[in-house]
UniProtKB/Swiss-Prot annotation:
Source species taxonomy: Eukaryota, Viridiplantae, Streptophyta, Embryophyta, Tracheophyta
Compositional bias segments (type: Basic and acidic residues): 254-268, 282-300, 313-323
Domain Cupin type-1: 38-257, 335-482
The protein, known as: Legumin J
Function: This protein found in the seeds of many leguminous and non-leguminous plants is the source of sulfur-containing amino acids in seed meals.
Signal sequence segment: 1-22
Region (Disordered), start-end ranges: 111-140, 185-235, 253-323
Amino acid sequence: MSKPFLSLLSLSLLLFASACLATSSEFDRLNQCQLDSINALEPDHRVESEAGLTETWNPNHPELKCAGVSLIRRTIDPNGLHLPSFSPSPQLIFIIQGKGVLGLSFPGCPETYEEPRSSQSRQESRQQQGDSHQKVRRFRKGDIIAIPSGIPYWTYNHGDEPLVAISLLDTSNIANQLDSTPRVFYLGGNPETEFPETQEEQQGRHRQKHSYPVGRRSGHHQQEEESEEQNEGNSVLSGFSSEFLAQTFNTEEDTAKRLRSPRDERSQIVRVEGGLRIIKPKGKEEEEKEQSHSHSHREEKEEEEEEEEDEEEKQRSEERKNGLEETICSAKIRENIADAARADLYNPRAGRISTANSLTLPVLRYLRLSAEYVRLYRNGIYAPHWNINANSLLYVIRGEGRVRIVNCQGNTVFDNKVRKGQLVVVPQNFVVAEQAGEEEGLEYVVFKTNDRAAVSHVQQVFRATPSEVLANAFGLRQRQVTELKLSGNRGPLVHPRSQSQSH
């Protein structure tokens, strides 16, 4: 009788302990958004590469823990190539400056871009085969780009100015089956760690977990030496031996050694001497004609090509709505939200707002992310509002202004000026208002953790509420209620009246 009773007691204690740990973990997760104050954040860490710069925000900031995201800002010099990488967290990228090309490697998709093959003998054809690869996409300033989790991608700057992009990694996304630690896996090169704070935590836990008794140290020391010989680089291929890679890819061992990149000091952004030669969806004769034209004409041509590509993607989207399913191989992954003609909300005196969500860019449905571009003219106001179903992250692109955020207790958790390069987290349902400065206005992009993020504006709520309710709720006279509901702009973009007009 005693043994079954003890077994049952042990099982009960184990289940109770597990439940307590789960409850504690859930409480900690939910408690991360109990923010008494919010700070404007700037990058905490930088990695300098041969042809660019990578900057990251510390993911341990309470604001970023609340939102469940991490951020990276990359600057790629002209002819700079950001090496192929992937992450378990889906990414949303906004192009702040410059233009370039981007390639993704979707598993199971064909290499639809091929070099034209000239007539030659079979022997010559075997020795020198034409290149082929998956689709290459152009992008430019103002584009929002969606990168699904686990999909390798590379970026190249073919412009004349630095390419600057801000990337959001949704570490709390359901697609990320690991923990909330931001991770970027590089296929090649010898990249430096982009989030050193989380690596230090992992190394500390690893040392604590692998503390061996004295009698077992000799064998473990030998294993560590063998591991160090293999892990000379920081790419995923660095962990495999050259011999194994040579066997796997059926190549020479010298090639396999280069794949491991053990002593490559160029880091994650490398310079391409002479420019990157890739297959474009145009004939060679047309390319030669373009090269013979002036620089300005070449830029006009590229803009026309981008517009044609946008139109083709729109047509494919319409075809999908008509019943022809869009495959992941040809899916539209980018949309420009900075063009004035693209504005969803517009006030000629206050500013404009554009939104990209799963309705305008269907791939965002799988990423569960969306974005908003806001440009406020001088003194323009984005009236008080809140995100109904998402956390949001406001990144200042240009200019300066003031942001005010209020929590559920009516406390002002943020009321400060913001400037170019700063990041402000706005938790779900926290009420926020933005106002541009007097000199150059305010331009910013907002990342949101829902593919169909909805916004509610205080002014809209007032107009949708019966006058008697407002009168009793705020102690207002009927004249004041009428003025509150009917005066001012219908939309959320407001240009304040001058002091003389307000009296």
